Amino acid sequence: MVIFETENFILKAPEKPHIDREDGGHLVIFTKKKVSERQELSKEQRCELAELTNIAGQALKEALCKSGIKIGRINYQDNGNWSVFKPEGPTLHIHIYGRAIDAKIQKYGEALYFPHPKDNPDFYKDLKPLNEEEIKYIKEFLKENFKYN
């Protein structure tokens, strides 16, 4: 689900997240144009991405805290490992993961664990996405706080 758009990027809340909302939630930033690596972005685009990443992480943390989920920190990752062997290659995207202090699956203070979906599809099967209220809060937070240009 698209939450927010800037000139060069799109922020989404995945319907099939890597992390259950109660473990901290999951957002993803995609580029509007096909880009494989950060180095392919202009300086202006890199600054826009950094600002969007920061504000989106803050919004995720606040939205989940309002839902009673204690977020200790936010992790940011751009890996692209699952698509390196696809003909089109990897596409730059940034994962934003909340880290809940009381997490049941992705334990707080430990490294995140993401098996390849082909190897372990059941791992992701029952993970709950952000709810409507959390998404609404994140949208409003970004509208109010994302000031770039």
Label the model's feature ranges:
Residues M1-N149:
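HIT superfamily nucleotide-processing domains
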